[in-house]
Amino acid sequence: MKKTGTYLLLLIACIHQLPSSAQVIKKHGQLHVDGTQLLDQHNQPVVLRGMSFGWHNFWPRFYNPQTVAWLKKDWHCTVVRAPMGIEPKGGYLDDSATAVQKVRAVVDAAIQEGIYVIIDWHCHNIRLKEATSFFASMAKLYGTYPNVIYELFNEPDHESWPEVKAYSKEIIDTIRAYDPDNIILVGSPHWDQDIDIAAGDPILNYKNLLYTLHFYAATHKQYLRDKANTAIQKGLPLFISESAGMEASGDGPINEEEWLRWILWAEQNKISWITWSVSDKNETCSVLYPTANSTGRWRKRDLKSSGIKTRMLLREYNRN
């Protein structure tokens, strides 16, 4: 009996030492938006923090359940993002079956692991017909799972806000036909930087919408935070679905001071943030070296400086 009691105490101690990501869906459940804030099932503010995979067609080797499990267990991610490449070689337009298979592998694993997951239409141009078909199929499959978040348009580049808005409303209607509740992320022009313009003419009469803001800290500094502050003051809810510490090219030196300013700003405003990317390209923003295992279990020597810093930030901020 004494041994049984000792084992029970040890088990309880181990459970209390688990990272918060272990219980994230159980804790937060169905998310919703109220004003500028993302709230959980208990109407409490929630900040999701995690990693974006790289384009599925360029770095497919990481799109597997083991990598998702490792990002949750070791990096303490509460959300992961699956960017489905659309236009480049090997993308959705070339091979839709493989594209969907890769995205579903990540989504299914995130559901299994009890964390949130973003289905990202990773495109720079409006492709209404293809996007409508894709999001209809995803909403049919996953509309009952509170884990799932839909990202309609990764980074509109030269499209105007009226064009992006019209496209987004069409896709929102498509998703809402099958999924009335889950969070939808709406892009804005100029690589998700013109959130202040979107705030002046937001999408009305739909619930649970957030607008994406992307930053790369060595390029995007206080001027972009000023635009974001303007958007928030106008009532626009934001979500940082892609970010990192180097230049907007994805390369160049990391500006750690400016990166930390962004993280502190996001935390102060209770805005979720995701870092780019789980990939091994020869550039600063890819957090892994080619030596990294395809299924997680990465050693410190497998991580670039951006990976070491991101892992540290995620483990620190997702600790509680």
Identify the residue ranges that each predicted region occupies:
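Bacterial Sec-dependent N-terminal signal peptides
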Residues: 1-23
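Extracellular glycoside hydrolase catalytic/binding regions
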Residues: 28-31, 55, 60, 78, ...
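Acidic/histidine-rich helix-loop elements
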Residues: 42, 46-68, 84-97, 248-251, ...
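Short, histidine-centered active-site or binding-site loop motifs used for metal coordination
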Residues: 52, 86-88, 121-123, 154-156, ...
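N-terminal carbohydrate-binding accessory modules
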Residues: 21-79
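Generic cytosolic/nucleocytoplasmic N-terminal low-complexity/intrinsically disordered segments
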Residues: 1-2, 42, 101, 308
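Aromatic-lined substrate-binding rim segments of carbohydrate-active enzymes
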Residues: 64-137, 176-178, 258-269
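Hydrophobic alpha-helical segments, especially transmembrane helices
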Residues: 3-4, 17, 50, 82, ...
